[in-house]
From Swiss-Prot:
GO terms for cellular component: plasma membrane. Pfam families: DAGK_cat, YegS_C. Its cofactor is Mg(2+). ATP binds at S44, G74, D75, G76, T77, L78, N79, E80, T101. Mg(2+) binds at S220, D223, R225. InterPro entries: ATP-NAD_kinase_N, Diacylglycerol/lipid_kinase, Diacylglycerol_kinase_cat_dom, Lipid_Phosphate_FormReg, NAD/diacylglycerol_kinase_sf, YegS/DAGK_C. This is Putative lipid kinase SERP0390. It comes from Staphylococcus epidermidis (strain ATCC 35984 / DSM 28319 / BCRC 17069 / CCUG 31568 / BM 3577 / RP62A).
Length: 307
């Protein structure tokens, strides 16, 4: 088999979701070394290291022949690599290997949740271009959330058990918290403004959030648009609505309690100021401005999911 890439770099954290990271790296390297003439294993010891390595790759201080990047980790680790690639305009394909608490975007890439199987799938993968959300000065691949989403993310980051289960970020969050904290908001999408009061808001680029899939059949991270969902009340009807698949043309007609707005440019302010979760990382507070960057990043995508 001809190796399609010259030099690949595999980034990983010692504290990823894998029980034995060193054996895991060995298994992954078997597949990736078949794709690259030279494979470098790069440990990220501290948050921000991956972004620094991206700068070094851009300046060719790391090496002058790097032509593919790999990441072993969850959505937060992937988010760091996405920010490094976007900040330093690295026009390099990225292969994603699941290894964290949540691996939502690997589902979008049709990759298996098992790291070994996913790395084998990369052997027959192809690069596709995906949209990126620019949120203030940060970059986001999958979602932006506030309200109940942040509370759940903080529970996970604190190391406590995920009390909301697989569908944590959407369905069970609404069902479980009986007295959520509400906030006033002013949301402008492509020049149209909506104001109101809510306890949860989600802006999605990808269709998979918190282990579950948003039941919007035409939601795509390759269409140049972001999808905003505003949760208006906390009745159990919302949970039922969430589980019913529909397309964007009839969402607002048949869905009670969740408004859907699609667009390319979003501004959001709240009272009081709210923490913002971006791909599982709580790095911002409102107000925020979101711009969709169409097909801004290349990700290796499997031809079909290997179940």
């Amino acid at each position: 088999m001809k190796q399609p890439y010259n030099h690949g770099v595999l980034f990983y954290h010692e504290h990823s979701g894998l029980k034995d990271i060193h054996n895991g790296i060995g298994e992954v390297a078997k597949s990736l070394s078949s794709m690259c003439k030279h494979l470098s294993l790069q440990l990220s010891e501290n948050k921000g290291d991956i972004i620094k390595y991206c700068k070094s790759i851009k300046n060719e201080n790391y090496s002058s022949d790097v032509d593919v990047l790999f990441i072993l980790g969850g959505d937060g680790t992937l988010n760091e690599l996405v920010n490094g690639v976007m900040q330093y305009q690295l026009n390099l394909p990225i292969g994603v290997i699941p290894g964290g608490t949540f691996n939502d975007f690997t589902k979008t890439l049709q990759l298996h949740p098992n790291f070994k199987t996913a790395s084998e799938q990369l052997l027959t993968s192809h690069a596709e271009s995906y949209d990126v959300l620019k949120v203030n000065d940060l970059y986001v691949l999958n979602f932006v959330g506030l309200g109940l989403i942040v509370q759940n993310a903080e529970n996970v980051q604190d190391g406590s058990k995920d009390i909301f289960g697989k569908f944590s970020y959407i369905g069970s969050t609404v069902k479980t918290l009986l007295n959520p904290v509400k906030f006033d908001f002013s949301l402008t999408v492509d020049g149209e403004t909506k104001e109101g009061n809510t306890s949860m808001m989600l802006i999605a680029n990808g269709p998979n959030i918190g282990g579950g899939q948003i039941p919007l059949t035409d939601l795509s991270p390759q269409d140049g648009r972001a999808n905003t969902f505003v949760f208006n009340d906390q009745t159990l009807n919302i949970l039922n609505d969430i589980l019913k698949k529909r397309d964007s043309m009839n969402w607002n007609e048949i869905t009670q309690g969740i408004d859907h707005i699609s667009g390319k440019h979003i501004t959001l302010s709240t009272n009081p100021s709210m923490k913002v979760d971006i791909d599982g990382e709580i790095n911002l507070e409102t107000p925020i401005e979101i711009q969709v960057l169409p097909k801004a990043i290349q990700l290796l995508t499997a031809t079909e999911q290997n179940n």
